């Protein structure tokens, strides 16, 4: 068999082999291409026979070799495309979606229990004629402490472990700075000031079941003429009844806060045992709920308010504590862990 016949036979055999490769035969296709057209392939071996040909036959056979190479290269490229398309089609078929199957139900979101509690408390105060005022979470030491009758050398500063950013800038430890700023701007010729300031506050507490390094407070302030301790008690009684039910009672116990004088701790009659004593109230019949008092005259004077003419009261309560008492939650960390099993209980 002469060289021309061998070249023609190689072309035909290779083309027949290529057409038999269907589906995912990419490796076999590559191996075939190397065995035919590679540096040590069949076509290269045939080319070695050119040296034995006459001078007249060499250009003829050389041309035929190039034609065979071109035909086979084109055939390999086409077959590679076919094999690749077959792979893609097989993958699509294996991953096909049955459009008749029911879809996955998206979970509907709901307002967080702290958001619900905050909105309920704010609605109570709005109904009582209070205005709601927001303030800065990053605050000046001056407004957070000094304006609350806590100068830099005051021992009561040790009552609050503080996150300081600089010597004069900190994360607020209460929302009282909002009251100081509002008191500075209030025009008493238009009437008394009645405000609440809700928001996040920060303390350097170790997180456990009853403590958190961040929590939510809502603090109230009323300043006007002839404001008395009786006004404070009446306001607190109304708030507690709206939060915990009309049958609830309160009691005031003497306490100490630098920014109020006199100061009181406010207890509410236990809503589980009705005051008889149980595990919730630790057998006392009462549950501590908030702190309050008459605004210290020095706090008023620092805002330019005449403490001889005006007086006021202030109070502060924790929203997490209210929610924990109302819903029987025994671990404050549940509010912040993002566990849907916890959150879905309060839809």
UniProtKB/Swiss-Prot annotation:
UniProt name for this protein: Phenylalanine--tRNA ligase alpha subunit
Cofactor: binding details: Binds 2 magnesium ions per tetramer.
Major subcellular location class: cytoplasm
Repeat among keywords: no
Encoding gene per record: pheS
Oligomeric and partner information: Tetramer of two alpha and two beta subunits.
HAMAP family: Phe_tRNA_synth_alpha1
Disulfide cysteine pairs (residue numbers): none
One Gene Ontology term, aspect cellular component: cytoplasm
Alphabetic keyword roster: Aminoacyl-tRNA synthetase, ATP-binding, Cytoplasm, Ligase, Magnesium, Metal-binding, Nucleotide-binding, Protein biosynthesis
Catalysed reactions listed for this entry: tRNA(Phe) + L-phenylalanine + ATP = L-phenylalanyl-tRNA(Phe) + AMP + diphosphate + H(+)
Top-level taxon of origin: Bacteria
Cofactors demanded by this protein: Mg(2+)
Pfam family, one: Phe_tRNA-synt_N
């Amino acid at each position: 068999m002469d060289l021309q016949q061998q070249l023609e036979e190689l072309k035909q055999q290779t083309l027949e082999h290529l057409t038999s490769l269907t589906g995912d035969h990419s490796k076999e296709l590559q191996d075939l291409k190397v065995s035919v057209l590679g540096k040590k392939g069949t076509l290269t071996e045939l080319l070695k026979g050119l040296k034995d040909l006459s001078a007249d036959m060499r250009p003829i056979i050389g041309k035929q070799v190039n034609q065979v190479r071109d035909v086979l290269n084109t055939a390999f490229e086409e077959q590679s495309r076919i094999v690749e398309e077959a792979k893609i089609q097989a993958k699509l078929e294996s991953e096909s979606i049955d459009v008749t199957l029911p879809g996955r139900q998206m979970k509907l979101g709901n307002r967080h229990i702290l958001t619900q509690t905050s909105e309920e408390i704010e609605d109570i105060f709005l109904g009582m004629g209070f205005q709601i005022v927001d303030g800065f979470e990053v605050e000046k030491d001056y407004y957070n402490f000094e304006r609350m009758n806590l100068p830099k050398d005051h021992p009561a500063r040790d009552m609050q472990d503080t996150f300081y950013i600089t010597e004069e800038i900190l994360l607020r430890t209460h929302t009282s700075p909002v009251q100081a700023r509002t008191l500075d701007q209030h025009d008493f010729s238009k009437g008394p000031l009645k405000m609440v300031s809700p928001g996040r506050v920060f303390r350097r507490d170790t997180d456990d079941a009853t403590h958190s390094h961040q929590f939510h407070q809502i603090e109230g302030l009323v300043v006007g003429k002839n404001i008395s301790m009786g006004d404070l008690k009446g306001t607190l009684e109304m708030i507690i009844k709206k939060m915990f039910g009309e049958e609830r009672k309160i009691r005031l116990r003497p306490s100490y806060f630098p920014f109020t004088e006199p100061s009181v701790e406010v207890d509410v009659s236990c809503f589980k045992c009705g005051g008889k004593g149980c595990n919730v109230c630790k057998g006392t019949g009462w549950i501590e709920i908030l702190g309050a008092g008459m605004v210290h005259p020095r706090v008023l004077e620092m805002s330019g308010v005449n403490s001889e003419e005006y007086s006021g009261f202030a109070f502060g309560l924790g929203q997490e504590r209210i929610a924990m008492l109302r819903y029987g939650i025994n671990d404050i960390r549940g509010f912040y862990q993002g566990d849907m099993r916890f959150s879905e209980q309060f839809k």
